[in-house]
Amino acid sequence: MKEFDYIEIRVPAKPQFVSVIRLTVSGLASRIGFNYDDIEDLKIAASEAVTNVVHHAYKKDGEGEIVIGCALYDNKMELMIADYGNSFNFEEIKTKIGPYHPEENIAGLREGGLGLYLMETLMDEVMINNDGGVTVFMTKYVTREQVEKNVERITT
């Protein structure tokens, strides 16, 4: 028996395809049994990763492809978003993620720069490989309601 189903999509690295990926991730997540909030988290994280590719990966060439892989398990969804464009230094970028740093002046808050922060906040696991392009691996586990499982034994 198959442990997981794998779906792979390749789209041009263009802004108009971000919504296609959001809809695809939403549909796949609902089939596994994710709740509404977790589906929204998955959509945001996936669209942030795809948007990063659109804005940063193919600056020199102007054209490229995004590969999106989705592994569907009974209890989790793994997303892989990959490009073959410019890589970056993850450790250096990681020090800059987040809405602000406590030592910064509020007047100097920058616009953008929240993509990696959001991905790490909304997903259960995030790994980035920047060897020959950038590949983002993200995992989200299905949250199961514990009360329903033991509802007959609960008394008030």
What label would you give each PLM region?
Residues M1-E8, V54-T156:
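Conserved beta-strand-loop-beta-strand hairpin that lines the nucleotide-binding pocket
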Residues M1-I44, E148-T156:
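Bergerat-fold GHKL ATPase/HATPase_c domain
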Residues Y36-D61:
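Conserved ATP-binding N-box helix of the HATPase_c
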